[in-house]
Amino acid sequence: MNRDYLRKVAFGISVDESIPSDPLVWAQNQFDAVPDFIWEKKLPTLDEQRDRYGHWVYQDREVLREKHKNDRLAYEKEKDHLRKITGERFFESLELSVRHSTALASDSPAFERMWHFWGNFFAISEKDFLASFSTGVYQREVIRPNMVNTFEDLVYAVTTSWCMLHHLDNAENIGPNSKEGVRENSDNDKRKVGLNENHARELLELHTLSPEANYTQEDVVEMAKVMTGWRHLWNNKKLEAGPIKFQTEYHEQGPYKILGKVYDIKDFNTVNQGKELKIVIKDLANHPSTRKHIAKKLCQHFVCDEPTDEMIASIVKAWEKNDGNLIEIHKATMETVFQYGLNHRKFSMPELWLLQNAKMLGLFYLYMFPQGFEFKGSKPSRSHKLVKDILWEIGHPIYRAKQPNGYIDLEDEWLSPELIIRRLAAARRFADITNPNVNYDQEYFENVILKNFDHPDNLLKLMKESTFYADRFAVFANSPEVMRA
């Protein structure tokens, strides 16, 4: 049995695939190395996307607005051309298509599920065209490679990435006693600079400790001081899109006191530039509250909304035993799901629901691009945008979370009548993106069900009562068995 397990940790299996003889080993073996993307075309790099973003914001803010300040129509026309040549409306569709192509065709679907988890955990919310240029490549190049390192490594990479630093305004976090802070506050400009706590607060609240650690506002302030100086290099032609560099002239020197521990690194700014952040992150990433917080989030994603202490403890134990090695944490999560998950049902967020239906039913929504596609200076076609459009339709635009805590992975967030109606409508249109080589008759649906469900009787009965072609997709996709894994 254990067919349900394949949906709890991955996306289910297609009718052409074999059920693994040992599902737990099958899942755990996927975490030893980072798998390749299922995409043959060239993918943009972080640096390339920063350059494109820089060209976009500079041309729009500094050139077009001044050039056409008295002609709104001319401004919109030229801005539309700018969108085209920079790919402002192209790259989100590209990144989502890469994500889905890999999820559906990879030999490591459990790894892909875990990547999706971390992408949402270290979310970049909708701000400043980040979804258009940067969020997808940030998840590819910052999060994904670090999934075989330690949690400490992952947090540090995310915290010091251009995308996260820009997202949480750390360029505005300036030490008031730093060289630049003193200079800017001593001139006649009414605008004064100082600490910006955004990034520090999210690092403590969301990415490491959680509020259960009972840290104080003073801890947040001290963390913000540590993080001063981590900022992009300003460029008159790229504005805020310059590379990240620790800049001592903006840094508030210590000592600092965080969670009762004093960090006093002598001559830090001239000897070990920027390394104090790494030292503090090491302590935060290995704090007992962090281990419990992350373990609970993993259980909530893969097992159920209200995980037990026993579930959480099994992941924490692996974390402690392996010094935060993510490979072992991921494997422990798979074992926890195997041990506890089959007695619990987890309501699927919309994207997961879509991917599981696509995998099980063999939906063919990337059929026009068997080798992928790449940016060639044009707007995306309707086919390029298909994945993005479906995600918008079902209320889950992955790269556009409204808050830094990402999308809330709890049933109450997704069980509204409006969102259920959206899924019903989308499922009825699954008939338009089916595999042309498959006959989606009653027998096919029966094979899908028997391959993916340990208790198939109710779903088989529902499908036998669905006589209309389009109805089969809606009934299957929105059945309790498919909505919850």
Regions found by a protein language model. Give the residues of each.
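Flexible, low-complexity segments enriched for small/polar residues
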Residues: 1-18, 24, 28-31, 35, ...
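General "foldedness" signal
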Residues: 19-20, 40-41, 45, 114, ...
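Short, compositionally biased low-complexity segments
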Residues: 1, 6, 87-90, 191-198, ...
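Active-site substrate-binding loop specific to GH73 endo-beta-N-acetylglucosaminidase modules
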Residues: 75-81, 96-99, 131-366
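Intrinsically disordered, low-complexity N-terminal regions enriched in serine/proline/glycine
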Residues: 4, 52, 57, 74, ...
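N-terminal accessory alpha/beta regions
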Residues: 5, 13-145, 171, 184-185
